C-alpha cells in the first residue's frame, strides 16, 4: 500500500476547471472515479491529514498509487463522464447499484420464433423482455395465469413445445384456450406475434388501449349476434379487471412516475424505487450498498454521520441521490436501447411485419425515464443532474420532493420500505449461524481474547437535557438477543437539575450491574454445598433460576461511547475487582472500538461481520433505552397535581377537572366553589384547596 504523499501531485499542477479524476492502484487498475467542479480544490482534500479522512476514503487513498484527471467543459459533462468511467472500469470503491438477481420478473422471449411468457429470476439475458420486478413470485404466476386467458400466448419450455409439435396435439392449456397452440399450427407465426404484442403492450402499461379494443370488439360481436364471441370477450375483460384490481390506484391522476427514497446508517445505504405507471404501482425494487465517505464537503467531516433514526438529516443523502439517479436511469436507457436493437434484429431475421411489431409498445427512453421523478431529497447539483436525466429521456423531466397530498403519503411508504430493507439486511448479516460464528471469531481475534465470546452485554443512556435519565442493558448470547435477560434502569445519582453526565451515568449503571453480579454469584450455591438435605430440588431451582442470569459475567461488556465512557467503566471494574470481562466502548459516529488505556481505537473493516454484530447490539441497546425513556417521559407528563391529594380518587379528580375545565382554573377557585361540585363536602373541598396551594 502506497503512502498518499508519494503520489501527491506537485503544487499548482492540478487545474481549477471542472473535471473527472481516477485513482489507480499499483497494478494500474482504476479503484475510484470521482467528479469535481474544481479539480484542484477537490483533489487537495485527499492529501491532507489522513487521520481526518472518512475510514473508507482513508482505505482508498492508501490502496492507490497514482491519480489522473480529465478536464471537461461543464459540470454536466463531468457527471456524464463519471458515469461512463464507472461503467467502464467498475472501480471497487465506487457505489454501484447492480441489478438485484433475487427479484422475480415476468419475462417474454421476444427473440424466439414463437415467443413465450415465463417466470424468471436471475441475470438478464439477450433476446428477452422483462416486466417487473415483483415483490413476490406468486404475483408473477397469478398475473400470467390471468392474462393468458386474454392473450393466449405460449408459456411452455422449448422441450415441451417440440414434444407436442412432434405429437401433433396441444397440451392441456391449448384445450382450455389458455394457449393459442402454435405448436400444432392453430395460429401462424404472425398471428401469435400479434398476441404477444398485445400482452407486452398491456404489461408496458397501455391498459386503457387494450380494454377499449376488447370492449369495442365485444359490442361489435353482440351487434352481429355472435353472442358466444361476445361472452368470451366479456370474460377477457373480467380477467383484465382482476389484474388491475391487484394493482391498486395510488395516484388518481394517472401519473407515470418513479418514487425514490433512501434509508442510511453510518456504513450503508438502502434505496427503494416504486414504479408508478398510469397511477398504479407496476414495480418495486431495492438495493443496499456501502456508503462512501468521500463526497464533496464530507471528505473530512465524517463526524456528521447520522445514527439512522432520521435519514433526511444525513448530509450524504443528496450525493447518494445524485449517484443513484444517474446510474439507475443511465443503465435503464442502455438496456432499452439494447433491447430495441435486438427487437429490430428479430424483425429482420423472422420477417415479422414491422407495423404490427411496433404496436407492442417497444421500450423507449421516455418509457424508462418517466416524466416525473419524486425524490426524498433534492440531489446534489440538482440543475446539472436534471439536465443529464432530460438528455437520457430525450424530453423534459420533473424531479422534485413531494410536499403534500397523495404523493407525499406515497413517498412516506417508500421511505418505510427502504428502512425495512436496511433493517432486514442488517439482521440477515448476523442472523445465520455461519455469519454469527464468523462475527464472534473476528471479535475474539480483534480483541485478543482466549475464546470467542459467548455472552455480550451492552448499556446505553437515554435522556432529553438531563430529564428522565434512563439506561438499558441488553444481552446477546451466541450472537443472538436474549431478551429475558434485558434490564432497564432509572439513573439516580448522575441525573437531576436538568443536566446529565453521561460519563457518570455509565459509571453508575456499570456499578449497579456488577454489584448485582457479585451478589448473584454468592446467591448461587457451589456444587459442594448440595448434600441432598440442606436444599430441596424446588429450593435449588428457585435460587439458581433467579440468580443465575447475572451470576456469571459477560465475556464482553460494551458501553455506548468513546474513551471517557470506557475510562469511567474501567474505574468501576477496578473498584469491584472485575478482571475477567473485556470492556470496550463503541463510538456511534465513526464506529470505533475503544479499549481501556489505549490512546487509539480499534478499527474493524467496514464489511466485517464482527462490526455488524456490534452495531446490532448497540442499536438494540439504543432502542431499548429510548423506548423506556419515552415511557417515563409520558408517565411524568400525565401526572397531575391532584394525584398527590389524599382521599381523592380517579372519579373525583375527573369530576373536578370536568367542572372547572382545567387544573389551572381549579386553583383559582375558593373552598366554597369547590364544595359546590357534586360529591365534595366542606372537609374534602378544604383538603383539595390546601393540597393545590401547598404545592406552589
Swiss-Prot record:
One Pfam family in the UniProt entry: UvrC_RNaseH_dom
Entry keyword DNA repair: yes
Origin: domain of life: Bacteria
Cellular component aspect of the GO annotation: cytoplasm; excinuclease repair complex
GO terms, molecular function: DNA binding; excinuclease ABC activity
Keywords annotated in UniProt: Cytoplasm, DNA damage, DNA excision, DNA repair, Excision nuclease, SOS response
All residue ranges annotated as the UVR domain in the record: 208-243
UniProt name for this protein: UvrABC system protein C
Gene giving rise to this polypeptide: uvrC
Amino acid at each position: 500500500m502506497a503512502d498518499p504523499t508519494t503520489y501527491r501531485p506537485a503544487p499548482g499542477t492540478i487545474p481549477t476547471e471542472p473535471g473527472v479524476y481516477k485513482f489507480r492502484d499499483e497494478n494500474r487498475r482504476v479503484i475510484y472515479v470521482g467528479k469535481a467542479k474544481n479539480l484542484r480544490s477537490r483533489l487537495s482534500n485527499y492529501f491532507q491529514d489522513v487521520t481526518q479522512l472518512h475510514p473508507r476514503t482513508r482505505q482508498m487513498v492508501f490502496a492507490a498509487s497514482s491519480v489522473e484527471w480529465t478536464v471537461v467543459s461543464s459540470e454536466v459533462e463531468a457527471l456524464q463522464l463519471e458515469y461512463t468511467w464507472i461503467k467502464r472500469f467498475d472501480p471497487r470503491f465506487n457505489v454501484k447499484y447492480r441489478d438485484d438477481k433475487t427479484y422475480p420478473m415476468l419475462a417474454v422471449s421476444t427473440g424466439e420464433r414463437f415467443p413465450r411468457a415465463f417466470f424468471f429470476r436471475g441475470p438478464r439475458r439477450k433476446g428477452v423482455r422483462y416486466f417487473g420486478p415483483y415483490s413476490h413470485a406468486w404475483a408473477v404466476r397469478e398475473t400470467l395465469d390471468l392474462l393468458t386467458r386474454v392473450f393466449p400466448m405460449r408459456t411452455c419450455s422449448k422441450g415441451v413445445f417440440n414434444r407436442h409439435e412432434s405429437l401433433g396435439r396441444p397440451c392441456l392449456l391449448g384445450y382450455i384456450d389458455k394457449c393459442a397452440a402454435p405448436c400444432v399450427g392453430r395460429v401462424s407465426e404472425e398471428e401469435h406475434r400479434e398476441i404477444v404484442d398485445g400482452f407486452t403492450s398491456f404489461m408496458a402499461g397501455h391498459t386503457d388501449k387494450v380494454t377499449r379494443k376488447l370492449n369495442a370488439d365485444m359490442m361489435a360481436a353482440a351487434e352481429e349476434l355472435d353472442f358466444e364471441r361476445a361472452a368470451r370477450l366479456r370474460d377477457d375483460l373480467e380477467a383484465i379487471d382482476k389484474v388491475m384490481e391487484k394493482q391498486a390506484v395510488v395516484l388518481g391522476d394517472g401519473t407515470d412516475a418513479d418514487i425514490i427514497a433512501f434509508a442510511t446508517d453510518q456504513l450503508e445505504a438502502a434505496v427503494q424505487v416504486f414504479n408508478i405507471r398510469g397511477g398504479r404501482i407496476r414495480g418495486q425494487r431495492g438495493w443496499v450498498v456501502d456508503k462512501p465517505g468521500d463526497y464533496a464537503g464530507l471528505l473530512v467531516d465524517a463526524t456528521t454521520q447520522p445514527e439512522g433514526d432520521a435519514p433526511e438529516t444525513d448530509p450524504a443523502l443528496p450525493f447518494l441521490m445524485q449517484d443513484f439517479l444517474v446510474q439507475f436511469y443511465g443503465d435503464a436507457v442502455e438496456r432499452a436501447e439494447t433491447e430495441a436493437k435486438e427487437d429490430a434484429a428479430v424483425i429482420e431475421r423472422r420477417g415479422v411485419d414491422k407495423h404490427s411489431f411496433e404496436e407492442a409498445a417497444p421500450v423507449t427512453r421516455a418509457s424508462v425515464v418517466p416524466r416525473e421523478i419524486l425524490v426524498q431529497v433534492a440531489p446534489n447539483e440538482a440543475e446539472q443532474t436534471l439536465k443529464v436525466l432530460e438528455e437520457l429521456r430525450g424530453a423534459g423531466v420533473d424531479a422534485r420532493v413531494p410536499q403534500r397530498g397523495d404523493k407525499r403519503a406515497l413517498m412516506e411508504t417508500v421511505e418505510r420500505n427502504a428502512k425495512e430493507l436496511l433493517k432486514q439486511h442488517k439482521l440477515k448479516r448476523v442472523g445465520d449461524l455461519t455469519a454469527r460464528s464468523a462475527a464472534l471469531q473476528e471479535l475474539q481475534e480483534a480483541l485478543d481474547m482466549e475464546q470467542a465470546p459467548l455472552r455480550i452485554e451492552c448499556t446505553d443512556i437515554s435522556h432529553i437535557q438531563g430529564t428522565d435519565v434512563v439506561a438499558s442493558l441488553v444481552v446477546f448470547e451466541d450472537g443472538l438477543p436474549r431478551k429475558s435477560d434485558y434490564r432497564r434502569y432509572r439513573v439516580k445519582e448522575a441525573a437531576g437539575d436538568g443536566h446529565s453526565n453521561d460519563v457518570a451515568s455509565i459509571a453508575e449503571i456499570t456499578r449497579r450491574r456488577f454489584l448485582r453480579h457479585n451478589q448473584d454469584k454468592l446467591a448461587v450455591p457451589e456444587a459442594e454445598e448440595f448434600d441432598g438435605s440442606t436444599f430441596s430440588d424446588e429450593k435449588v431451582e428457585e435460587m439458581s433460576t433467579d440468580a443465575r442470569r447475572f451470576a456469571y459475567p459477560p465475556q464482553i461488556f460494551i458501553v455506548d461511547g468513546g474513551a471517557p465512557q470506557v475510562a469511567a467503566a474501567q474505574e468501576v471494574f477496578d473498584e469491584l475487582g472485575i478482571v475477567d470481562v473485556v470492556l470496550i466502548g463503541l463510538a456511534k459516529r465513526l464506529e470505533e472500538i475503544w479499549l481501556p488505556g489505549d490512546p487509539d481505537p480499534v478499527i474493524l473493516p467496514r464489511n466485517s461481520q464482527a462490526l455488524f454484530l456490534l452495531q446490532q447490539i448497540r442499536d438494540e441497546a439504543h432502542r431499548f433505552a429510548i423506548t423506556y425513556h419515552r415511557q417515563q417521559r409520558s408517565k411524568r407528563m400525565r401526572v397531575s397535581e391532584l394525584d398527590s391529594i389524599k382521599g381523592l380518587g380517579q372519579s373525583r379528580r375527573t369530576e373536578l377537572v370536568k367542572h372547572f375545565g382545567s387544573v389551572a382554573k381549579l386553583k383559582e377557585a375558593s373552598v366554597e366553589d369547590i364544595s359546590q361540585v357534586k360529591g365534595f363536602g366542606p372537609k374534602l373541598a378544604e383538603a383539595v384547596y390546601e393540597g393545590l396551594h401547598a404545592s406552589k
